[in-house]
Curated annotation (Swiss-Prot):
Monomer. It catalyses: cytidine(2498) in 23S rRNA + S-adenosyl-L-methionine = 2'-O-methylcytidine(2498) in 23S rRNA + S-adenosyl-L-homocysteine + H(+). It comes from Xanthomonas euvesicatoria pv. vesicatoria (strain 85-10). Its EC number is 2.1.1.186. This is Ribosomal RNA large subunit methyltransferase M. The keyword NAD does not apply.
Length: 347
């Protein structure tokens, strides 16, 4: 088959399928999505897979943790010899710079983790012997992915290192530090890692910058910013953890974060308030339109139904009401739940 395989959060396959279908149609490439709920991945079948992959940048896809171009789908693999059919499917292919053997992050896929680990150790030397894999990882070469969907069913796919998630399964392995005020700190950590390039992070998140955290309590997102030596005004009627205040970088204002506005423009505004997504999108747009912040990261809590439609509506609403020339990226992060995280920055 020809097409793309994209990983996603279990249960969000319909949203990813709808997104891929809409984006493919927008760039004029015909295709269809193949998936089932709770699979943890979507296969988008199309004849122009390489062209579609080039037009759908990984950072621009909202519900895709990873984006890969399919080489082959192998079914009915003999468990006693999985290597031979894989080598046959790759015959004549260019050399790869790395190998990742994976499985979907789903209830059905997680039991395949042991197989993925052990099979990777067996496949790697076989690929090198066949001249299909470099001796050491080479970022300039495409990366081979073998994704086991079952013990006898695998998808072979290729990733461009410059346009794919740099983590197996598309999941950054972040550790929740003991001093983190809440697990939500991982969301902002992941957002900064995923939505910004390394060059953008260096340029846009600098010591001495000023930020506001709306709905800050107990201080997870504020704490992440202080670790970057950013001065934070934390706005919430609720309390912050004492050690967050002790950094000397935090001013806690007991106020309604949804209505507060700064006295002077800030470098950043971040917001993880539990509110209706359209209301949040409109308020975030006001912050950008009025020049109260240069850049923002905020979360949109999605409804149980029609989540792709609501996502498009909220992002369109935000961009229309912001009335600024912006770079907008959105992702359903690994540490997100029924929500997406949005980055908006000045061009």
């Amino acid at each position: 088959m020809s097409g793309l395989v994209c990983y996603c959060r279990q249960g969000f396959e319909p949203e990813l399928a709808a997104e891929l279908s809409a984006r493919a149609a927008f760039v004029g490439i015909a295709g269809y999505a193949r998936t089932q709920r709770n699979d943890g991945y979507v296969l988008f079948v199309c004849d122009e897979a390489a062209q579609l992959a080039a037009k759908l940048q990984w950072r621009e896809l909202i519900f895709a943790r990873q984006k890969l171009v399919v080489i082959a789908e192998l079914k009915g693999i003999d468990p006693k010899d999985r290597i031979t059919p894989i080598l046959a499917a790759l015959d004549g292919h260019q050399r790869f710079g790395d190998l990742w053997v994976e499985h979907p992050d789903s209830d059905a896929g997680k039991p395949l983790a042991g197989l993925a680990r052990s099979f990777g150790n067996a496949l790697r030397p076989a690929l090198r012997k066949a001249g299909l894999l470099t001796d050491k990882p080479q970022l300039r070469q495409p990366r081979l992915h073998v994704c086991f969907l079952d013990g006898d069913h695998a998808v072979l796919a290729v990733a461009d290192n410059a346009d794919s998630a740099p983590w197996p399964l598309g999941i950054p392995r972040l550790k929740l530090l003991p001093e983190a005020p809440s697990r939500s700190a991982l969301k902002l950590d992941e957002a900064l890692l995923t939505l910004l390039t390394p060059e953008e992070r260096d340029a846009l998140v600098k010591p001495g910058m000023r930020a506001a955290d709306l709905g800050a309590a107990p201080g997870g997102w504020t704490w992440v910013l202080t670790r970057q030596h950013v001065h934070v005004t934390s706005v919430d009627n609720g309390p912050l953890r004492e050690h967050v205040l002790e950094t000397g970088l935090v001013e806690h204002l007991r106020a309604d974060g949804f209505h507060w506005k700064p006295a002077q423009p800030l470098d950043w505004m971040v917001c993880d308030m539990v509110e209706q997504p359209r209301r949040v999108a409109e308020r975030m747009a006001t912050w950008v339109r009025e020049g109260w912040c240069r850049n923002t990261i905020f979360n949109l809590k999605l409804p149980m139904k029609k989540r792709w439609d609501e996502t498009r509506l909220c992002l369109d609403l935000f961009e229309q009401q912001a009335e600024k020339s912006l770079i907008v990226r959105a992702k359903q992060l690994y540490h997100d739940r029924e929500e997406i995280t949005v980055l908006a920055m000045r061009e």
